[in-house]
Amino acid sequence: MKAAMQYQNKTPEEIVRQYKKRLRAKQGLIILILLLHIIINIRGIWWGDDGMADVLLKLLILIAVTFPINVWISWDFMSLNLILNQNCDPVTYVQVLCLLEKVHKRKRSAVAIRINEAAGLMWSGQFSDALALAEPLRKYKLSVNYQISLLNIRFNCYKKMEDLERAMQVKHEAEVLVSSFKKASLQRTGQELLNVMDASLALWRGDHETYRRMEEARSARYTAKLQKVVSVVCLADVDIACGELKNAKTHLEYAIQEGGTLYVVEDTRRMLAELTQKEQG
């Protein structure tokens, strides 16, 4: 993906510097438009040319002009997720987000940064640190997408730390949240989260056939490289358990090649070494 390439082979400082440069340019453009709007309105009111209808019309025009710029700013922020999702580099991702805390000081932005940082820490294998960041964020009023992200982070971290009781508590929280959704689109998103949790628990219990069936059905829809890498590592685990060593080796080699700094790569190297030993033995 071309957009993800812009973050490759760059230090966190370079990425944030470029991000700030683009952000300041867009913010400057908004300020310029606002000043122009104020000057035109003052002139119109002062000379008595503008009535209330004219003022409201100009306000609507202002909103229409600045809205795409605000969307552009939001897109720039969201595009940083490509460092994690496409470049599979949670280490750089976390460092970038730490630097961004000094750029975005508004509460809403700070909470979004911390949730994303917790995800980066999780994919770096720093599960206790991710939980330390994620748990306090539950007290905030979050968008549905961020609520789902937070539930996913907490569930995965507790499961990886083998705290099944807390993982199941998080799953119950997810079920309660999903049951409250009215919109069909939110219900689908919520159900997908529950399916991911069910599949993960099936793998954890050693129910390999159930996991394979669920994961193969989902993996056809994966677009992010991170999803593909994590999927093939889990499927390799299933392949090994089922004696399908050739498939397992193919999956593991792909994960090592594409997995970047994801914590699963370390597990993958260990699994591949054990598999090679089996073949030689």
What would you call each of these model-derived segments?
Residues A64-N70, C98-R108, E135-V144, H172-R188, ...:
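Solenoid-like repeat scaffolds
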Residues K26-G44:
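Canonical alpha-helical transmembrane segments of integral membrane proteins
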Residues W72, L84-C88, M122, K159, ...:
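Hydrophobic/aromatic side-chain positions at a characteristic register within alpha-helices
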Residues A53-V55, L82-C98, L121-E135, D163-V176, ...:
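Helix-turn-helix repeat elements of alpha-solenoid scaffolds
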Residues D54-N85:
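Transmembrane alpha-helices and immediately adjacent membrane-cytoplasm interface residues
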Residues D207, Y211-G281:
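Long, non-transmembrane cytosolic or organellar matrix-exposed soluble domains/tails
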Residues M1-L23:
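Cytosolic juxtamembrane N-terminal segments of multi-pass membrane proteins
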Residues M78-S79, S109-N116, Y146-N156, K160, ...:
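"A position-specific structural signal for the A-helix of alpha-solenoid helical repeats
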